[in-house]
Amino acid sequence: MTGASLALTAAVVAHAYYLKNQFYPTVVYLTKSSPSMAVLYIQAFVLVFLLGKFMGKVFFGQLRAAEMEHLLERSWYAVTETCLAFTVFRDDFSPRFVALFTLLLFLKCFHWLAEDRVDFMERSPNISWLFHFRILALMLLLGVLDAFFVSHAYHSLVIRGASVQLVFGFEYAILMTVILTVFIKYILHSVDLQSENPWDNKAVYMLYTELFTGFIKVLLYVAFMTIMVKVHTFPLFAIRPMYLAMRQFKKAVTDAIMSRRAIRNMNTLYPDATAEELQAMDNVCIICREEMVTGAKRLPCNHIFHTSCLRSWFQRQQTCPTCRMDVLRASLPTQPQTPTEQQNQHQNQAQQQPTPVIPPQPNFPPGILPPFPPGMFPLWPPMGPFPPVPGAPGGNPPDEANPGSSSGSSPRPGETSNVGSESQPGAALPGFPFPPPFLGMPILPPFGLPPMPMPPAGFTGLTDEELRAMEGHERQNLEARLQCLQNIHTLLDAAMLQINQYLTVLASIGPPQPPISSTSTSTSSAASASTAPTTSNISEPVIPVDTTSTVTNTESSQQSAPPAPVSVETLSGAEGGETTTEEPDNVELRRRRLQKLETGTTDSQ
């Protein structure tokens, strides 16, 4: 690209000189021709790029990948802000204006590279004299250029009034604060490298340096915005750098306050680690990678570090270096227990814990509940008796439930009443008033789940180290245990909810009708249905009490002599004296029922 731009520039200049044949007319032609100026601009940018690479080789040598990445990332934003500045100062747009902005962007790039290279000193163990010479020479050159351009902008504003030099003056003033921060950091890193032991107060000085320079940047941007709004227009290109400066200053203030609080808590709340605690665990500080002998602090999460390392760490962030626990929100640490104390405590708890009293299981009829596999719900308490079903018949004998039949007439001689001897299906099952539903259906296990797996036999074959590795003391282990307990609690709640729904449905369906086993059962059911029409789904007319008594006596006579066939004419003749006084509809209804009972008796025989 360099050769192409050079050849294109030479061709444009030669063409202009060929047309004008003199130097001055050639220069005028090149400045007035837009294509020629575009080619010259491209050539100027190429020359600036070559100059930047040359100065980078001189002051930095080989750039690292992180430095190149930061440079490209910041350059895109700087170019965008420069284009926005061109739109704000479009009346002052000229080759000189473009050259000044190009020079400003060029110097900004070297300020960014100097800042990254000085930060690299903290992570590099070996710093050569050539490195110091390059950094000092670069900082001196950049400082002189910044001061010169600030002075030039000031004199231009004093002599010519408000112009585009106002922007350049504030930009170079901001760059002066950047180079001041870089110089102070360089001094602090150099002092730290000269000392044999790590310098504990370096982080404090760096924090207050960033706080001071950040405050100066915020003041400069606020003053620049105020002056630009009053003199020219709203500086849209300064919004992003002003926001970044304010955010950096706010972060520095917050870090200063939180670090002082964390260091105060470390000095007052956190206990010193004892020699036994250091021997019982890995005594290597993960911050400095050196062994801890004395001067170590134990955090609330029971992690131990050097006091000086913690002080430097808390200047940057207020979390545990190992588990990232917020030390400002943690409670007062508790003394860790030795394995012997933990074993004694577990034994005492096991002795003091009373034996749980298991209440007796309710007497449920077989088949009313599906057979639960053993061990499926080991944590459930024993279930109590089921709630009574509203409207379900109890264990009372039928003569109490139907007083009309007993008071209306007395049994005849020779007849044995079977009403009192009849037994309801639910009366023989204490604790549950009705038989199990769905007698013909196979009973499935609840929810279709297989039985729970049996717990492991024991951990006798594992060593202490393996048990500690399985238990875990880090944050992710505790979170995994809590999540497992929450899952178990959720599954138990869901299972209990489904069981309650099952019991509710079971109680709401009511007792099913028992199967017809004998003539007496069928006759009693028909008599009960005729005396209690409210329990039937079909509305029927009410039959008087005397009629019911007659039917009951007739049924008793039928039960006492089963071989003799029962006919409608016999029963009708026995009741012939009473039918004359009843209505024709009731007589017809009774006749049909007796005919139905006769048919049922014949089928059962």
Swiss-Prot record:
Residues 230-264 are annotated as: Interaction with p53/TP53. It is an enzyme of class 2 (transferase). Zn(2+) 2 binds at C301, H303, C320, C323. SMART domains: RING (SM00184). It catalyses: S-ubiquitinyl-[E2 ubiquitin-conjugating enzyme]-L-cysteine + [acceptor protein]-L-lysine = [E2 ubiquitin-conjugating enzyme]-L-cysteine + N(6)-ubiquitinyl-[acceptor protein]-L-lysine. InterPro entries: HRD1_E3_ubiq-ligases, Znf_RING, Znf_RING/FYVE/PHD. Zn(2+) 1 binds at C285, C288, H306, C309. GO terms for cellular component: endomembrane system; endoplasmic reticulum membrane; endoplasmic reticulum quality control compartment. It is a multi-pass membrane protein. Its EC number is 2.3.2.27. Pathway: Protein modification; protein ubiquitination. Residues 334-433, 513-605 are annotated as: Disordered. GO terms for molecular function: ubiquitin protein ligase activity; zinc ion binding. Residues 465-496 form a coiled coil. Belongs to the HRD1 family. E3 ubiquitin-protein ligase which accepts ubiquitin specifically from endoplasmic reticulum-associated UBC7 E2 ligase and transfers it to substrates, promoting their degradation. Component of the endoplasmic reticulum quality control (ERQC) system also called ER-associated degradation (ERAD) involved in ubiquitin-dependent degradation of misfolded endoplasmic reticulum proteins. Also promotes the degradation of normal but naturally short-lived proteins. Protects cells from ER stress-induced apoptosis. This is E3 ubiquitin-protein ligase synoviolin A.
